[in-house]
Amino acid sequence: VAQSFDTRTGLLERFGRPLRLAILGGGPGSWIGHMHRSAAELDGWWRVVGGVFSGDPARSRDGGALLGYDRERCYGTLDELVAGERARPDPAEAVAIMTPNDTHYPLAAAALDAGLDVVCDKPATHDAAQARDLVARTQRHGRLFAVAHGYSAYPMTRYARHLVNTGAIGELRYVQVEYVQSGLAPRIEDAPQNNRLRWVLDPRRSGLALVMSAIGCHAQHLASFAVNRRVTSVCADAISVVPNRE
C-alpha cells in the first residue's frame, strides 16, 4: 500500500538540488500561507526563494522580508517577479498561488505564459471556460499545472483508494463524504471592512459557488479520488444556515 520515495530520489538525482519555488500571496497574516510555505519545504523537494506576498507592492516587499526571504526576491507584482527571476542564474522554476479566488485564473495564465510551472490553490478558476483556457495554455507552453488537493496524499485516503481498487470492500454502491468547517459560522459581515475573510462572501471574488468552491470541492475531490471514478453529473441543494446570509 505504501509508496516508496523513488520519485524524490530520482528528482534529486536529476537536478542535484530542490526545485526553486516562488510564492504568490500567503504573506504575514495570511490564514493559508504558512501552511503552503511549510508544506512546500517539508520533504526537501522544494525551496521557497521569494515571491509576491501581497497585492500591495510595498506590503509584499516588507512582508516577504519579514518572513525571512531575500528582499531582492520579494517583488511587488508578478511582472516584476518574472523579470527579476529571469535575470538571475538561479531563477524560480515554479510558482505557488495562494491568493483570493478571483486572482487564481489571471495569475496562473500569466505564469504559464511566462514559462513557469504552476501549483494553484483551489478553486483553480471561477468557471469551466477559464479552466479549459488554463489547460490549453499548459499544453501550448509544455508546462505543468497542479491544483492543491493535498488530502489525496494522506495515508488514510491512499489506503481507502487501495481498498476500492483491489475490490477488498466488495461492490461499490454508495459514497458519502462530509467536509465540515466553522470558519464562516460567525457573522463576519459585521466585522471591519479589512477583515481578512470578508472577501469570501463576495461572489465576485469568491465565485458564484461561494462555499461550494471553497470546501465543497474538497469533498468532491476526495470522493472521486478514493473511488477512482470521475463525477459525470451534479445535482445539489444549497442552503444558508447563517441568518440573513445568501
Identify the role of each PLM range.
Residues Y151-R245:
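Predominantly a Rossmann-like dinucleotide-binding segment in NAD(P)-dependent oxidoreductases
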